[in-house]
Amino acid sequence: MSNKPVYVTQPYLPPLEEFVPYLQQIWENKILTNGGPMHQQLEAALCDYLGVEHIALFNNGTIALLTALQALRVTGEVITTPYSFVATAHSLLWNGIKPVFVDIDPHTLNLDPTKIEAAITPQTTAIMPVHCYGNPCDVAAIQKIADNYNLRVIYDAAHAFGVQDAGGSILRHGDLSALSFHATKVFNTFEGGAIVCPDAKTKQRINNLKNFGIVDEVTVVAPGINGKMSEINAAFGLLQLQHIDRAMIRRREIDQTYREQLKDIKGIRIVAEGGQNVANYSYFPILIEADYPLDRDALYQKLKQENIFARRYFYPLISEFPMYRGMPSAQRNNLPVANEVASKVLCLPIYPALDNDDLARIINSLRGH
């Protein structure tokens, strides 16, 4: 059996020759950025594919999050999860907003709605949940709390491309949803991101903010930044869309194989599927319990020695990093579930090019063979 390196993910790259005509078109257009034709085509194509009304493309998902907060004029305190990539909380700090961490649900690993109300103060202006691993948050419960307290809801939907619940795209919930199109994501544009928004007026404000606040040659309406996606990134996204359904099918096959082959291994708990009608199989997290022969870190090292590079997403918690750990909400006794999960979680390799031999190699290693 092969011993080649297997990483937790690998960017999906369509055949290079299929990308060349897009590049030729860009060269002919002589437009490289500033909302050119590829950018416009991708926005329209994504609205159609995702089933949303309005989407604004960005150069990355973090700038999209930063701009979403600016677009809604969020200030004060925002309730969020400690169990995410650091960009979730960093986007708050960069906007001068105080993140307030709330514990996660032990089954979904998303923000626990039953813990939110106790964290609300007079300074709270919004909730920023994360659809962790692409599993939908309890959007109804979160929205009910937001409505009761007049709070905004901004979803960090970096993992949730293409995910649907019974009513359609999960991205339609809340005031805004921010996506990441980073190379590690299910759908990528090398680097990129987007904000899904409910109406044309909000999209116009977002478009202004991502272009320095410029409206026309003589009018600047806000202190914006440069968050624009280039034509090359947008073109790659258009090509990716032609392949995304096929890529999702392979991800689902890998997910189902893991679930079937690992379900009876003592000490491995598979994170439950989120109840969504359409999943994107972006990650495959497992929890290593006390009755497994190795603890999580020992298994992580064993796999690494075998050239299998799983990842401990998300360890450490955001709340453990120096810029956050002094906050009252970051204290471990406030986040018992998140701390326990962070000490047990391991995300296994999942990507369309992962072949069955390497999949079997991973499973056999987990079985102790």
Language-model region placement:
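Short, conserved catalytic or interaction motifs in soluble domains
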Residues: 60, 104, 132, 183, ...
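Active-site PLP attachment segment
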Residues: 172-208, 231-234
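PLP-dependent aminotransferase class I/II
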Residues: 37-45, 49-53, 114, 118, ...
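Phosphate-binding glycine-rich loop
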Residues: 31-77, 83, 91-94, 101-103, ...
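N-terminal "arm"/small-domain region of PLP-dependent enzymes with the aminotransferase-like
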Residues: 1-32, 349
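Structural detector of well-ordered beta-strand residues that form the stable sheet scaffold
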Residues: 56, 79, 100, 153-154, ...
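PLP-dependent aminotransferase-like
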Residues: 70-157, 164
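Conserved active-site segment immediately N-terminal to the catalytic lysine
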Residues: 155-189, 216-221
